[in-house]
């Protein structure tokens, strides 16, 4: 499969989870937007991705509705793994006409921080860190060289920012700033924008 334009990176540490993406939206060598948010908060979870922007937005809307439906139907919150599995099933249902996107999905529940990587047909892989999109090869090298599950969320945020900046320097479809989303082990959410 051709590499999907954009770069998104996720990192799980003992204190929480961080997802980040750059903001450039490009197609066929053209920059369509410099303000495209590709990191989403869905209920108490985070999702980031690379690929067709409209597909990412559609998946975000579907997941918002499905998670709310699950919680209203069962009367209890959905776990991170169950929500990731739900996303996997949704992607698989569209395997004939797939959503053209690679996705990072994560959150924190009673089992601690969790990070999952999904491809366009719903393959679900749990990992400590991951990068997707056209800048993934560059970003993953930065993560591999410095990752430590015991690092603080502040250090994790610095590392993920360094990984995205490295991909922006080498990947023409990535750029125009960095969106970061953080959930700590207590479930507190924070988002940041870093101009670059």
From Swiss-Prot:
One of its GO terms (biological process) is proteasome-mediated ubiquitin-dependent protein catabolic process. The formation of the proteasomal ATPase PAN-20S proteasome complex, via the docking of the C-termini of PAN into the intersubunit pockets in the alpha-rings, triggers opening of the gate for substrate entry. Interconversion between the open-gate and close-gate conformations leads to a dynamic regulation of the 20S proteasome proteolysis activity. It is an enzyme of class 3 (hydrolase). One of its GO terms (molecular function) is endopeptidase activity. Its EC number is 3.4.25.1. The keyword Protease applies. The keyword rRNA-binding does not apply. Keywords: Autocatalytic cleavage, Cytoplasm, Hydrolase, Protease, Proteasome, Threonine protease, Zymogen. It is found in: Cytoplasm. PROSITE patterns: PROTEASOME_BETA_1, PROTEASOME_BETA_2. It catalyses: Cleavage of peptide bonds with very broad specificity. GO terms for cellular component: cytosol; proteasome core complex, beta-subunit complex. The active site is at 7 (nucleophile). Residues 1-6 form a propeptide. Component of the proteasome core, a large protease complex with broad specificity involved in protein degradation. Belongs to the peptidase T1B family. The 20S proteasome core is composed of 14 alpha and 14 beta subunits that assemble into four stacked heptameric rings, resulting in a barrel-shaped structure. The two inner rings, each composed of seven catalytic beta subunits, are sandwiched by two outer rings, each composed of seven alpha subunits. The catalytic chamber with the active sites is on the inside of the barrel. Has a gated structure, the ends of the cylinder being occluded by the N-termini of the alpha-subunits. Is capped at one or both ends by the proteasome regulatory ATPase, PAN. This is Proteasome subunit beta 1.
């Amino acid at each position: 499969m051709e590499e999907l334009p954009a770069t998104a990176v996720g990192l799980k540490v003992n204190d929480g989870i961080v997802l980040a993406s750059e903001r450039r939206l490009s197609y066929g060598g053209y920059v369509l937007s410099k303000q495209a948010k590709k990191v989403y908060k869905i209920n108490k979870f985070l999702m980031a991705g690379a690929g067709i922007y409209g597909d990412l937005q559609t998946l975000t809307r579907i997941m918002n509705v499905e998670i709310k439906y699950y919680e209203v139907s069962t009367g209890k919150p959905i776990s991170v793994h169950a929500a990731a599995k739900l996303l996997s099933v949704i992607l698989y249902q569209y395997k004939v006409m797939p959503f053209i996107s690679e996705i990072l999905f994560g959150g924190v529940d009673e089992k601690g921080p969790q990070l999952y990587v999904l491809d366009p047909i719903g393959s679900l892989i749990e990992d400590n860190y991951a990068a997707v999109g056209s800048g993934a090869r560059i970003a993953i090298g930065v993560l591999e060289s410095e990752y430590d599950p015991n690092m603080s969320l502040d250090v994790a945020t610095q590392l993920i920012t360094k990984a995205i900046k490295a991909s922006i320097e080498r990947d023409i479809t990535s750029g125009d700033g960095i969106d970061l989303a953080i959930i700590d082990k207590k479930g507190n959410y924070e988002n940041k924008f870093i101009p670059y």
